[in-house]
Amino acid sequence: MDSLTTALGSVPQVVQWALAGVGALYISAKVLSYLHLVLNLFILGGTNLSKYGKKGSWAVVTGASDGLGKEFASQLAAKGFNIVLVSRTESKLKELAKELEAKNGSLKTKVLAMDYEQDNDDDYEKLGQLLSGLDVAILINNVGRSHSIPVPFLQTPREELQNIVTINCLGTLKTTQVVAPIMAQRKRGLILTMGSFGGWMPTPFLATYSGSKAFLQHWSTSLAEELRSSGVDVHLVLSYLIVSAMSKVRRPSAMVPTPRAFVRSALGKIGCATQNVAYTYTPWWSHAIMQWWVENTIGIGSKIGLQVNLKMHKDIRTRALKKAEREAKKA
């Protein structure tokens, strides 16, 4: 201790004051960052949906037949928006349309059975024709695909790799190219694209999915700045795990919300800046706190983070393969 005191005493006082000032600024920045997070998560409300269109205007929801997409459609319908449902299975879409119309009085719906995996230009033409003349206020880019189980990139089936990129990237871009001009013409609109922690943080054993979601992050942020002057708000919505068929998680918890709870927070926190990337928000409180902690401790691209992610997804893969083996023996 005496040697440390002696060493510090030999440092010029002006340097000591400079170091103390830098330390104080660093700590203050972290405290302010956390307070900003808490303010946006628990106190401030998001942009009211009425900014984008009055009741009776239209919302387009992709991947609408199940999970988050179905919940976005349900909650937007309850808020007075007519709904265009886009997904692969026509029977599910028609069933959901009837359900929404029964619950919401004068609600109107339109459906388009569209397999994004096929990347068929005729489907996008049909979407454009379906939307012709409609007052489209909102687009929810929810359609997406992940790996069936975590898998090393070198073992990823080529068809799975292609489908992930085609659906997550091309499908989202082409849909937005159909819908966004309608919004730009009417000088207002909202585009929400579902991101993922898998794209925010590099994720070994989900490399293709991770890359596709990282692509959407940069695309969405760039598009947001392009369309800002047109009155169209564009946001990427980040999440960790949600109870869904894609996540294969069935039991909700503080860290894993139900689709209903997550969508309620997503629609209630539009534009609340819960992280450092512009036009991006993480609406679910525990996800946002975990994100802040990772960014301010180990870092999103650090070797430690990559190693933890790798081990976690290796373990998930091992359990999934063992389960498949047990089920095969029972058959």
Swiss-Prot record:
<feature type="binding site">
    <location>
        <position position="60"/>
    </location>
    <ligand>
        <name>NADP(+)</name>
    </ligand>
</feature>
<protein>
    <recommendedName>
        <fullName>Very-long-chain 3-oxoacyl-CoA reductase</fullName>
        <ecNumber>1.1.1.330</ecNumber>
    </recommendedName>
</protein>
<keyword id="KW-0812">Transmembrane</keyword>
<keyword id="KW-0444">Lipid biosynthesis</keyword>
<feature type="binding site">
    <location>
        <position position="123"/>
    </location>
    <ligand>
        <name>NADP(+)</name>
    </ligand>
</feature>
<keyword id="KW-0472">Membrane</keyword>
<dbReference type="GO" id="GO:0042761">
    <property type="term" value="P:very long-chain fatty acid biosynthetic process"/>
</dbReference>
<keyword id="KW-1133">Transmembrane helix</keyword>
<dbReference type="Pfam" id="PF00106">
    <property type="entry name" value="adh_short"/>
</dbReference>
<feature type="binding site">
    <location>
        <position position="244"/>
    </location>
    <ligand>
        <name>NADP(+)</name>
    </ligand>
</feature>
<dbReference type="GO" id="GO:0045703">
    <property type="term" value="F:ketoreductase activity"/>
</dbReference>
<dbReference type="InterPro" id="IPR036291">
    <property type="entry name" value="NAD(P)-bd_dom_sf"/>
</dbReference>
<dbReference type="InterPro" id="IPR020904">
    <property type="entry name" value="Sc_DH/Rdtase_CS"/>
</dbReference>
<feature type="binding site">
    <location>
        <position position="115"/>
    </location>
    <ligand>
        <name>NADP(+)</name>
    </ligand>
</feature>
<dbReference type="InterPro" id="IPR027533">
    <property type="entry name" value="3_ketoreductase_fungal"/>
</dbReference>
<keyword id="KW-0275">Fatty acid biosynthesis</keyword>
<dbReference type="InterPro" id="IPR002347">
    <property type="entry name" value="SDR_fam"/>
</dbReference>
<comment type="similarity">
    <text>Belongs to the short-chain dehydrogenases/reductases (SDR) family.</text>
</comment>
<feature type="active site" description="Proton donor">
    <location>
        <position position="209"/>
    </location>
</feature>
<feature type="binding site">
    <location>
        <position position="142"/>
    </location>
    <ligand>
        <name>NADP(+)</name>
    </ligand>
</feature>
<feature type="transmembrane region" description="Helical">
    <location>
        <begin position="15"/>
        <end position="35"/>
    </location>
</feature>
<keyword id="KW-0521">NADP</keyword>
<dbReference type="GO" id="GO:0141040">
    <property type="term" value="F:very-long-chain 3-oxoacyl-CoA reductase activity"/>
</dbReference>
<dbReference type="GO" id="GO:0030148">
    <property type="term" value="P:sphingolipid biosynthetic process"/>
</dbReference>
<feature type="active site" description="Lowers pKa of active site Tyr">
    <location>
        <position position="213"/>
    </location>
</feature>
<feature type="binding site">
    <location>
        <position position="209"/>
    </location>
    <ligand>
        <name>NADP(+)</name>
    </ligand>
</feature>
<keyword id="KW-0443">Lipid metabolism</keyword>
<keyword id="KW-0276">Fatty acid metabolism</keyword>
<feature type="binding site">
    <location>
        <position position="242"/>
    </location>
    <ligand>
        <name>NADP(+)</name>
    </ligand>
</feature>
<keyword id="KW-0256">Endoplasmic reticulum</keyword>
<comment type="pathway">
    <text>Lipid metabolism; fatty acid biosynthesis.</text>
</comment>
<dbReference type="GO" id="GO:0030497">
    <property type="term" value="P:fatty acid elongation"/>
</dbReference>
<keyword id="KW-0560">Oxidoreductase</keyword>
<comment type="function">
    <text>Component of the microsomal membrane bound fatty acid elongation system, which produces the 26-carbon very long-chain fatty acids (VLCFA) from palmitate. Catalyzes the reduction of the 3-ketoacyl-CoA intermediate that is formed in each cycle of fatty acid elongation. VLCFAs serve as precursors for ceramide and sphingolipids.</text>
</comment>
<dbReference type="GO" id="GO:0005789">
    <property type="term" value="C:endoplasmic reticulum membrane"/>
</dbReference>
<feature type="binding site">
    <location>
        <position position="213"/>
    </location>
    <ligand>
        <name>NADP(+)</name>
    </ligand>
</feature>
